[in-house]
Swiss-Prot record:
Similarity section: Belongs to the TRAFAC class myosin-kinesin ATPase superfamily. Myosin family.
GO BP term (any one): actin filament organization
Residue segments, region Disordered: 1-34, 949-1076, 1135-1235
Pfam families assigned: Myosin_head (PF00063), Myosin_TH1 (PF06017), SH3_1 (PF00018)
Chief place where the protein resides: cytoplasm
Region: Actin-binding, residue numbers: 405-487
Biological function: Type-I myosin implicated in the organization of the actin cytoskeleton. Required for proper actin cytoskeleton polarization. At the cell cortex, assembles in patch-like structures together with proteins from the actin-polymerizing machinery and promotes actin assembly. Functions as actin nucleation-promoting factor (NPF) for the Arp2/3 complex.
Organism field: Neurospora crassa (strain ATCC 24698 / 74-OR23-1A / CBS 708.71 / DSM 1257 / FGSC 987)
Polar residues bias locations: 1050-1062, 1180-1210
Lineage of the species this protein comes from: Eukaryota, Fungi, Dikarya, Ascomycota, Pezizomycotina
Cleavable signal peptide: none
Name this polypeptide is given: Myosin-1
PANTHER family cross-referenced by the UniProt entry: MYOSIN, MYOSIN-3-RELATED
């Protein structure tokens, strides 16, 4: 039914107006094929996975990582895999392509997340936040910087103040990275703190200010690092790049001088230039607005921290701590502007207040004094970092009214180590709070959309982790943080006693997500169970900055020290200061309050490997990250309702091609509303009703398979058009190719390859079962081709080698390949060097290629007459090393390495005059020096499959047994007959251009009309094949009245009149005698190890069903039918066949057109690479050699065309028909010879 357009019909216009169409210009444009479309790797959105599992997610991420696609969506969540290389995807051109684009219009990218957040902030006046999580080295900081880069680029604002704010926001990155990042084992630029950057915008979407909140600074890194890690970057930048003024004022020396920077013995990092980054840090300070005085104060405190680390204590005469070097104390006191005696007193005397108004001073031992020194250094750096963040916020403070904001959270991901302590508890607690935000915001938004669109759906079930958050942060009943603080109060002087008290509190808690253990406890987080060790956990929670140290800071004459430590010390106040857990709980709740007021976007970062390799993808490690990031849960939550949703307009624009009612030749022809067009498309594509729903403004699709089907149909639309154009051309090319291939195939079977196989078998005899073999050496496809480099060729690289080394015209190369020669150098280890090995009918050449003045020069390094080679030495292992025992008095014997050694030995044996001596032993014998024999040991201890030589020893791996022979020759994969085309007509495939017949070798004669039952009558497959190749035969006299007989005549044959006299057809020839069974006697026992191998015992008689040239015969016993090795059995002479009496000859007038039964083609060979599967039934053998016809109902094949000779007259029609049949059958016999 055609589509009627009534563009001037008022009713139609009214209908379109009611349907929501704004104007005629809003309809989709004419569809055109996208020639720049890039083939998608995997799926770009994990919600479209057919099977949702951690393994399926991991496999999809791997495909995209290997295809240089590092970004993948989970709905609105972005998953990012660190590429460890520059992919060129952050250029200004790429950034411009994402401006103003919808998330679905462009491939997944961090710019798309930034664009979505900025667009939603402006369009809906909603505060936005981007939450970035993942393990160290996964790319969190890089993602945060790219979001800031995009927002700074697209947010406009040409005024100087706006540009200044943008510059300061971008300058915070190098500054905070210097003070908050460090080199770890897993990441050279690891963020050791969390931050939340909030950019404020005015009503026009221009940035007018920002503020930063920092979390969880790893201050313990200041005083200690594990091996091959570093302190914070700023210490190495400062000690390497400090000006001469700073070196004189603050005594700055190289990082090797200070304990805090040299403890881990790591001073430089690949890819990090400390001097250049120090200048970037100073420049960032200037952009943010730090004065020179403020910069001096910062570096003064850094110097104090470095010198504090060099303050070493020793045990005094009284048994307590004493200072080892007073000069360090004096210089540290100078930097802090305190009295040296007061400094020593603060570090070596502990102030206790057991009762109000009572102060007790207790001397400290060496470990206690060292801990106090480290606490002083950590306190200075921790407060200095907080001051820098506050100073940045002061410079970035908005100077006009703020409308909305975009927040970027870059924080630790879940941490699960072998030993987890207080730090991991705090990090995982913050992640639990972030997961709580995800549950409340994301799932709630999902439910609101379904309700707004009036969609019928099943409520999403999810785990509410509020119970876990309460377990950690609750005060009534006490949670983990509160119990930790109470334990510190109870036994504040003894950390071990505090830990025991805390463990008692844990044992008394009743919570399904808490499990006490011996000296530990398990918390069931949403990302998995984590076991936390109690040892030392309370000591990390309490404030280690003693009141004596606080008194020291208050006594300082430096105003900046007072700024860092503003609180006054009240000696009478016994109330504990806020613990680390208290501060984490307060800041986490403040962060949650801020994020709950925002619309979130999520970025999950993944680290593909631990080696920072751009090509390695460590599947187990990534799978672990997929699990603890909860990607599978994210996908299931997204798919719990509908996997795909889109507005009516965009859905129609994408899929209108799929319905003939909405499109014609790529043009959009629908005149109704978009909602009606959407419904029509889904109806015409036969999408089940339960797979989709239409809301108020959007179409919802349930499963990703449905969306895949729609996308597939859309892609096939263009392919089908191209297929129509290509079909006839391909048919002609197929005819030419098939004709050439069939000619070549028959020629190769008869002529090519026999001599190479015979030479390969001779190679086994040369080794004589004395040397282990490599698996590749005994493959069935291995051929001994000899001249691999083409030395005998007249042109090409081989001819160049021949001319360069002077091989005479009377010499013929029998073998050539590349190998190695062991070179002995004075004072140095022997080293294999590449060489070219050439064996001619008279000499053995060792050819070297050297670089001479920029040109490659080929020369014959050594040339040995074959007659001079007394022996060839090799080992019994599978290695490729061998020696040539020349026995020269002037030069040593060469020790060579050649992967084709067996073939080389075989060729040499064929052409060497005299005897061929191959010495195979446990070691390789050769003359390392003239007249001095040496043995090269061979050890089977190589860590890899690659052999290597070291210190007169060849290291290899165990090989195949020495008595191994070549595997059976793999068979070519059976290819179904292809259609042979001639002009515009397509003929069936198979030999001779006709359908191939059944491959059953035991089949009886072809059925004859009027004959008895046959195989074709009982086998549907054989029956159909026989019907396709049957010839018309005249009916018996009197059979015309039978409807079946009448139907058997072809339509072009005249009907016989009742008065005509036609001789009856001759009787059919007797069925050929049954083929005698081939029996064989078992010579040796054989135990089958595979399903298609038959176990046999010596002395048994078995029937041979089929023989193959690959050394395997198909045998049959009462136990079953399978393959046995031909070498294990001996064929027995068959019994003489019983000759059936021949029938009397037919009457002379009648021509015997029955012909003989055409011989059957041999069964096809099994699939290449393995033995053929057993063929227990006749039907399976028939299927193996079945033909393929492409004619269908257009005809019965070429045989039918040959049997359709019209009858010239009624008289003699029988004789002519039989004669034509005989000729056709004779031609068929000729065709059989091709097989």
């Amino acid at each position: 039914m055609g589509i009627t357009k009534r563009s001037k019909d008022k009713a139609a216009r009214a209908e379109r107006s009611a349907g929501g169409d704004k104007s005629s210009s809003a309809k989709p444009k004419k569809a055109t094929f996208d020639t720049t479309k890039k083939k998608e790797i995997g799926v770009s959105d994990l919600t479209l996975l057919s099977k949702v599992s951690n393994e399926a997610i991991n496999e999809n991420l791997k495909k995209r990582f290997e295809g240089r696609e590092i970004y993948t969506y989970i709905g609105h969540v972005l998953v990012s895999v660190n590429p460890f290389r520059d992919l060129g995807i952050y250029t200004d051109q790429v950034l411009e392509s994402y401006k103003g684009k919808n998330r679905l219009e462009m491939p997944p990218h961090v710019f798309a997340i930034a664009e979505s957040a900025y667009y939603n902030m402006k369009a809906y006046s909603e505060n936005q936040c981007v939450i970035i999580s993942g393990e160290s080295g996964a790319g969190k900081t890089e993602a945060a910087k790219r979001i800031m880069q995009y927002i700074a680029n697209v947010s406009g604002g040409g005024s100087g103040d706006i540009q200044q704010i943008k510059d300061m926001v971008l300058a915070t990155n190098p500054l905070l990275e210097s003070f908050g990042n460090a080199k770890t084992l897993r990441n050279n630029n690891s963020s050791r703190f969390g931050k939340y950057l909030q950019i404020h915008f005015n009503a026009q979407g221009e940035p007018i200010g920002a503020d930063i909140t920092n979390y969880l600074l790893e201050k313990s890194r200041v005083v200690g690092q594990i091996a091959n890690e570093r302190n914070f970057h700023i210490f190495y930048q400062f000690t390497k790049g400090a000006s001469q003024q700073y070196r004189e004022m603050y005594g700055i020396q190289k990082p090797e001088t200070y304990l805090y920077t040299s403890k881990a013995k790591c001073f430089d990092v690949d890819g990090i230039d400390d001097l250049a980054e120090y200048q970037d840090t100073l420049n960032a300070m200037k952009i943010i607005g730090l004065s020179q005085q403020e910069q001096d104060n910062i570096f003064r405190m850094l110097s104090a921290i470095l010198w504090a680390g060099n303050l070493v204590f020793k045990e005094g005469d009284d048994g307590y701590a004493a200072v080892s070097d007073q000069s360090v104390v004096d210089f540290l006191a100078y930097l802090l502007e305190v009295d040296p005696a007061q400094l020593v007193h603060a570090l070596t005397i502990r102030i206790l207040t057991p009762r109000p108004g009572e102060v007790i001073e207790s001397p400290a031992n060496v470990p206690q004094a060292t801990a106090t020194r480290d606490a002083l250094a950590m306190a200075i750096y921790y407060n200095l970092f907080d001051w820098i963040v506050e100073r940045i916020n002061l410079s970035l403070k908005a100077r006009q009214a703020t409308t909305n904001s975009i927040g970027i959270l870059d924080i630790y991901g879940f941490e699960i180590f072998e030993k987890n302590s207080f730090e991991q508890l705090c990090i995982n607690y913050v992640n639990e709070k972030l997961q709580q935000i995800f549950i409340q915001l994301t799932l709630k938004a999902e439910q609101d959309e379904y309700a707004r669109e009036q969609i019928k759906w099943t409520p999403i079930k999810y785990f509410d982790n509020k119970i876990v958050c309460d377990l950690i942060e609750s005060t009534r009943p006490p949670g983990i943080f509160s119990a930790m603080k109470d334990a510190t109060k109870t036994a504040h002087a003894d950390p071990a006693a505090s830990d025991r008290t805390f463990m008692q509190s844990i044992n008394g808690m009743s919570n399904p997500h808490l499990t006490p253990r011996q000296g530990a406890f398990i918390v069931k987080h949403y990302a998995g169970d984590v076991t936390y060790s109690v040892d030392g956990i309370t000591d990390k929670n309490k404030d280690l900055l003693l009141k004596g140290v606080q008194n020291l800071f208050q006594a300082s004459q430096n105003q900046f020290v007072h700024t860092l430590f503003p609180q006054q010390v009240d000696l009478d106040n016994r109330r504990q200061p806020p613990s680390a857990g208290d501060r984490i709980r307060t800041s986490a709740n403040a962060l949650v309050d801020t994020l709950m007021k925002c619309q979130p976007s999520y970025i999950r970062t993944i680290k593909p490997n631990e080696n920072k390799s751009p090509t390695e993808y460590n599947e187990p490690n990534v799978l672990h990250q997929v699990k603890y990031l909860g990607l599978q849960e994210n996908v299931r939550i997204r798919r719990a309702g509908f996997a795909y949703r889109q507005s009516f307009e965009k859905f129609v624009d994408r899929f209108f091609l799929l319905s003939p009612a909405t499109s014609y030749a790529g043009e959009y022809t629908w005149t109704g509303s978009y909602e009606a067009a959407t419904k029509q498309i889904l109806k015409d594509t036969s999408i089940p009703q339960e797979e989709w729903q239409l809301g108020v403004t959007k179409a919802f699709i349930k499963s990703p398979e449905t969306l895949f089907a729609l996308e597939h149909m859309r892609d096939r639309y263009w392919h089908n058009m191209a297929t129509r154009i290509q079909r006839m051309w391909r048919a002609y090319l197929a005819y030419r190719a098939e004709a050439a291939i069939r000619i070549q195939r028959i020629w190769r079977k008869k002529r090519v390859g026999a001599e190479y196989l015979q030479l390969r078998e001779e190679g086994h005899k040369v080794l004589g079962g004395r040397k282990e073999r490599r698996r590749m050496s005994i493959l069935g496809s291995r051929r001994f081709l000899g001249d691999y480099l083409g030395i005998n060729a007249t042109t090409g690289p081989g001819a160049q080698i021949r001319n360069a080394i002077g091989i005479g015209s009377n010499e013929k190369a029998v073998f050539s390949c590349r190998g190695e020669l062991l070179e002995h150098k004075f004072g140095r280890s022997s080293k294999p060097s590449p060489r070219i090995l050439v064996v001619t009918n008279s000499k053995f050449y060792i050819v070297a290629q050297v670089l001479n003045q920029g040109h490659v020069q080929i020369m014959a390094e050594k040339a040995f007459p074959l007659a001079s080679i007394k022996f060839i030495g090799a080992s019994t292992a599978r290695d490729d090393w061998f020696s040539l025992g020349v026995g020269s008095q002037q030069e040593p014997d060469p020790l060579l390495n050649c992967v084709l050694k067996t073939e080389m030995f075989t060729q040499m044996k064929r052409v060497m005059p005299g005897s061929f001596n191959l010495k195979i032993g446990d070691a390789i014998e050769y003359a390392k020096k003239p007249g001095k024999m040496q043995l090269v040991k061979v050890l089977k201890d190589a860590p890899t499959s690659q052999d290597f030589y070291k210190s007169s020893t060849v290291h290899t791996q165990p090989g195949e047994p020495p008595n191994s022979v070549s595997r059976p020759q793999p068979k070519a994969k059976p290819v179904p007959p292809r259609p042979i085309t001639k002009g515009k007509l397509i003929k069936p495939g198979g030999p001779g251009g006709r359908p191939a017949r059944n491959a059953n070798p035991n089949r009886t004669a072809q059925p004859r009309p009027g004959g008895g039952p046959s195989i074709a009558a009982s086998n549907p497959l054989a029956s159909s094949a026989a019907a396709a190749s049957s010839r018309p035969v005249p009916a018996h006299p009197g059979a015309a009245a039978t409807p079946a007989a009448a139907k058997s005549l072809p339509s072009h044959t005249r009907q016989q009149s009742s008065t005509s006299t036609v001789r009856p057809p001759p009787p059919p020839p007797p069925a050929p005698a049954a083929k005698p069974k081939i029996m064989a006697k078992v010579l040796y026992d054989f135990a089958g190890t595979r399903e298609n191998e038959l176990s046999i015992k010596a002395g048994d008689m078995i029937e041979i069903v089929q023989k193959e040239n690959n050394g395997w015969w198909l045998a049959k016993t009462p136990e079953g039918q399978a393959w046995v090795p031909a070498a294990y059995v001996e064929e027995q002479a068959p019994a003489p066949p019983v000759v059936a009496p021949r029938p009397p000859p037919p009457p002379p007038p009648a021509a015997n057109g029955g012909g003989r039964v055409a011989p059957q083609p041999p069964a096809k060979r099994p699939v290449a690479g393995r033995k053929p599967a057993p063929a227990p039934a006749v039907a399976s053998l028939q299927n193996r050699d079945s033909g393929m016809s492409l004619n269908g109902a257009n005809g019965s094949g070429s045989d039918a065309s040959r049997s359709s000779t019209p009858t010239p007259s009624i008289a003699g029609s029988l004789a002519d028909a039989l004669k034509a049949r005989k000729q056709a059958m004779a031609k068929r016999d000729d065709d059989e010879d091709d097989w």
